Design a protein with these regions (language model features):
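Structural preference for solvent-exposed beta-strand-turn elements
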Residues: 1-324
Length: 324
């Protein structure tokens, strides 16, 4: 039976992170739990809902090896409310656990670990390494354009496409297309990662340039190894939108605008808009100038920004929220 002692901050970090992958409501009670497995002084903490899994291994002071599943919400709340210091986990009878810290003792019931699903393993597939900050950046700059309505489920994720030694990360929601390109030496292949997985990766990835993430995928599973966490994800299947038909279209209209100035200008238009009052924002390009104009029942905004543009006057309208 499992017995160990651990610093509150260490176990709380592992529990709250892996709990994000635990099911919030399932007919299988084990899926609502966090799986604890102790071997020596290494405690492996896992949350898994059959779609997303997060695993972490931390150092503890082990007394007796064992395995136990605990309700994720309950164990996180208990540990969070414990005072700082060492917490002792003591399974004194099968599926009966004491948690002790200073003069506080909680006694809770565990869940049969035999009901807990096994994390997927990749028999074969593709893998590549990428710095954690770079992976964080490409996800962060494309995730906003992932579809949120499941009319075509494969679009509810971002496509990672390696082609001609270049990594393209693409998100499409039917209105916007976001693409980020980076050099990556690898054979051609592609896969689609669900938005939920990408959101969790954003929280876990570091800004430390020295840290490297390993991405491994097969036909329908992906594994992301990042520092002290391993993220498991079912991949999305289906025909992704062929963005090359739009992005590859020739155009003789091109303008270069200062990003900060443009964002500040478009942000000002939001003062004239609300849930009931909606209006497009007009962009007019002419002679190295971009005119941004928006008029509603509340008022109007008219501003000019310097830009690099030459050619005939060109006007186009956008939803301001999609520009931001």
């Amino acid at each position: 039976m499992i017995k160990f002692s651990v610093q509150k901050n260490d176990i709380l970090d592992a529990l709250t992170t892996t709990a994000k992958a635990a099911s919030t409501k399932s007919v299988i009670s084990a899926l609502e739990g966090i799986h604890l497995s102790l071997t020596g002084n290494q405690l492996t903490v896992t949350g898994y809902d059959l779609e997303l899994g997060i695993k972490s291994t931390i150092d503890v002071e082990g007394e007796s090896d064992g395995v136990l599943v605990l309700n994720s919400r309950l164990i996180c709340d208990i540990v969070r409310k414990m005072p700082s210091g060492v917490i002792r986990f003591d399974e004194y009878e099968p599926l009966k656990l004491n948690l002790m810290c200073e003069d506080i003792t909680y006694s809770i019931m565990g869940i049969n670990s035999e009901e807990y699903p096994v994390l997927p393993e990749l028999s074969r597939g593709e893998s590549f390494e990428i710095s954690e900050p770079l992976l964080k950046s490409v996800i962060g700059q494309t995730l906003y354009a992932v579809a949120t309505i499941d009319t075509k489920p494969v679009l509810m994720g971002s496509k990672f496409e390696i082609k001609n030694n270049e990594l393209n990360v693409i998100s499409v929601d039917g209105i916007r297309i976001a693409i980020r390109k980076e050099s990556l030496l690898h054979e051609d292949f592609d896969f689609v990662v669900p938005a939920k997985t990408l959101s969790e990766l954003l929280r876990l990835l570091s800004d430390d340039e020295s840290k490297i993430a390993t991405v491994s995928v097969d036909r329908n599973q992906g594994i992301f190894s990042i520092d002290k966490y391993t993220v498991f994800s079912r991949l999305l299947e289906g025909d992704f939108f062929d963005y090359t038909k739009i992005i590859g279209m020739p155009s003789n209209i091109e303008a270069v605008v200062n990003v900060r100035e443009l964002m500040e200008c478009v942000d000002r238009t939001l003062l004239l808009l609300n849930d009931k009052i909606k209006s497009p924002v007009d962009f007019t390009f002419s002679d190295n100038t971009l005119r941004v104009f928006c008029e509603t029942a509340i008022g109007k905004l008219d501003q000019k920004i310097k830009c690099d543009y030459s050619g005939e006057e060109f006007r186009i309208s956008f939803n301001s929220r999609y520009i931001l």
